[in-house]
Amino acid sequence: MKLALIGIGQAGGKVVDALVDYERRTKTGFVVDAIAVNSARADLRGLRTAPESRQVLVGLTRVKGHGVGADNELGAEVIAEDVGEVLSMIDDLPVHEIDAFLVVAGLGGGTGSGGAPVIARELKHIYTEPVYGLGILPARDEGGIYTLNAARSFQTFVREVDNLIVFDNDAWRKTGESLEAGYGSLNAELARRLGVLFSAGEGDGSGAVAESVVDASEIINTLGSGGVSTIGYAAVELDRPKRGLLSRLSGGKAEADDGGDSTNRITSLVRRAALGRLTLPCEISGAERGLVVVAGPSDVLSRRGIERARTWLEDETGTMEIRGGDYPIDSNFVAAVVLLSGVYDVPRVKELQAVAIETQRDMLAKRESSAASLDDLVSTGDDRIEPLF
């Protein structure tokens, strides 16, 4: 699937960095172009893969290149005011080569959470290609204002895109990691999952041909349910001489390849992917649509295993709209990616909304209390001191 990536804000830019880095290392060619949009000049300078010619600094007259300070209403305003600059850069893209746009943003900050829905709305108004969102939820300990930002952005973003893929930082952060290392590893994990999913079917024709091809139409149909999506992933290393692009499929445990266990291996991987750590933890029963992609050497991609895994996922989700296919690549790993679209039983989102409501109430009460306290401070009580004007 050919994508145009648009990273909004600091987190969005760094995730796009990770996706482009993955695509370049694996030479899979699913990224047609990538653009970074931010209100903070320093954040744009920190990007590795987006050259200055593919960067847009917005809000220069309002915030002078210093960012919006986690104010997502201001973030939405500065993006809306300068959206013409963003669209002008997008106009330069070879849109005829693009299957979809992917707008990426952290939902807890200011520029990304406020601006991503604005960009998505404009893209849907102008282009016929699907516009998908990738939203990153803040961790619980990042603070109430970021939770409130995320809750407000979430309900707006999901309305403006054709489908919103969600990644929950809180479910993936490891204890003891530094902030920079933690987010770096999370971005790499997310890029691996999305990379395997979107690069399926994008080979140059020189390798093995998939028996059941997963192309752009399969992904578009799966995401066609709208709403919210989550992605699962599992990988296992084959016990044989290493070869090929090992970095593409990593993180699995070593396992012997006896030639007759391919079916069981694939069904086990798909179960682990669907029932393990999803990008957004949720109850998978009730998902509207699903897609299974199994990647690895062609000689271990059992068609029977993929069909059994697909049938199992139909039973678990309760929907017959489960697509599946293989993705032959030269690797020493076998990996399964499960995309679940239209999920709705998501406790984390309900928790996020509850905390956001409480934060909003506290902020309003504090604002009213502060105004009254200031009046008490400046008042002399008997009104004998006159103000200057």
Curated annotation (Swiss-Prot):
<keyword id="KW-0963">Cytoplasm</keyword>
<dbReference type="InterPro" id="IPR037103">
    <property type="entry name" value="Tubulin/FtsZ-like_C"/>
</dbReference>
<dbReference type="GO" id="GO:0005737">
    <property type="term" value="C:cytoplasm"/>
</dbReference>
<dbReference type="GO" id="GO:0005525">
    <property type="term" value="F:GTP binding"/>
</dbReference>
<protein>
    <recommendedName>
        <fullName>Tubulin-like protein CetZ3</fullName>
    </recommendedName>
</protein>
<dbReference type="InterPro" id="IPR003008">
    <property type="entry name" value="Tubulin_FtsZ_GTPase"/>
</dbReference>
<dbReference type="GO" id="GO:0051301">
    <property type="term" value="P:cell division"/>
</dbReference>
<dbReference type="GO" id="GO:0003924">
    <property type="term" value="F:GTPase activity"/>
</dbReference>
<keyword id="KW-0342">GTP-binding</keyword>
<feature type="binding site">
    <location>
        <position position="187"/>
    </location>
    <ligand>
        <name>GTP</name>
    </ligand>
</feature>
<dbReference type="InterPro" id="IPR048737">
    <property type="entry name" value="CetZ_C"/>
</dbReference>
<dbReference type="Pfam" id="PF21011">
    <property type="entry name" value="CetZ_C"/>
</dbReference>
<keyword id="KW-0547">Nucleotide-binding</keyword>
<dbReference type="GO" id="GO:0005874">
    <property type="term" value="C:microtubule"/>
</dbReference>
<dbReference type="InterPro" id="IPR017975">
    <property type="entry name" value="Tubulin_CS"/>
</dbReference>
<dbReference type="InterPro" id="IPR045061">
    <property type="entry name" value="FtsZ/CetZ"/>
</dbReference>
<feature type="binding site">
    <location>
        <position position="169"/>
    </location>
    <ligand>
        <name>GTP</name>
    </ligand>
</feature>
<dbReference type="GO" id="GO:0032153">
    <property type="term" value="C:cell division site"/>
</dbReference>
<feature type="binding site">
    <location>
        <position position="142"/>
    </location>
    <ligand>
        <name>GTP</name>
    </ligand>
</feature>
<keyword id="KW-0133">Cell shape</keyword>
<dbReference type="GO" id="GO:0008360">
    <property type="term" value="P:regulation of cell shape"/>
</dbReference>
<dbReference type="InterPro" id="IPR036525">
    <property type="entry name" value="Tubulin/FtsZ_GTPase_sf"/>
</dbReference>
<dbReference type="InterPro" id="IPR032907">
    <property type="entry name" value="CetZ"/>
</dbReference>
<comment type="similarity">
    <text>Belongs to the CetZ family.</text>
</comment>
<feature type="binding site">
    <location>
        <begin position="110"/>
        <end position="112"/>
    </location>
    <ligand>
        <name>GTP</name>
    </ligand>
</feature>
<dbReference type="GO" id="GO:0007017">
    <property type="term" value="P:microtubule-based process"/>
</dbReference>
<feature type="binding site">
    <location>
        <begin position="10"/>
        <end position="14"/>
    </location>
    <ligand>
        <name>GTP</name>
    </ligand>
</feature>
<comment type="function">
    <text>Involved in cell shape control.</text>
</comment>
<dbReference type="Pfam" id="PF00091">
    <property type="entry name" value="Tubulin"/>
</dbReference>
